[in-house]
């Protein structure tokens, strides 16, 4: 198995994940809508799935407001000022003071945390939807979310849940950008071609007619592992950055961890592997 298979097996052993490890013959019988190479190994994680992101964000906001949080939307943050008895978060509309600050700024992390300059790359990542037979590739038909590790890179997808069809994207690759405010959201023909080639080989019954596309950004650390730490400028600032395309699924756990770090509570985790100064 490749790096992906070995990583899943190691995680399964460490965290007691419910998985089925099968050869390609068994996988072909179970999921005939996928075309597996003869030398592939397949793992099915029974409790895995996918998130409805906008619904999840709304739920987080609702729960936070219920707990007393105030939302200030539409502010552009200029800096988090240190040196005083309180930290100051300076925006284009007003200044907030706080005993501690959590920074989860994604592609803008290095703008607020100078120690991250040169440690992060921002990648433009196109996402694509394709027309697909609902009897084969829909969530209601039992089509699983999937990730293929192939000779041309890693590709993932989610079953169809609406009229847009099957969602597919390339996890590897990407187009490096320097300014997230100038992100070009137009279709990249080369990236579309890579995804189309993957579909022809491994999901041949999916239409090559794309129904939609959008663009997101990965903020990638040097080793593709999260950076979770206190800021060098002031220990009262805690942050998570460089989530490398995996951040949202960990949002609940990261939020709880960062809140405990900011308030000085014990969290019980060894964060050495995620420190900004790791080697």
Language model: regions and residue ranges:
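Dinucleotide-binding Rossmann-like beta1-alpha1 core, especially the glycine-rich loop
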Residues: 1-30, 154-155
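Short glycine-/acidic-enriched loop or helix-start segments at secondary-structure transitions
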Residues: 5, 31, 82, 112-114, ...
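Active-site catalytic microenvironments for nucleophilic, acid-base chemistry
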Residues: 63, 108-111, 115, 257, ...
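Active-site substrate-recognition segment that forms the wall
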Residues: 100, 107-236
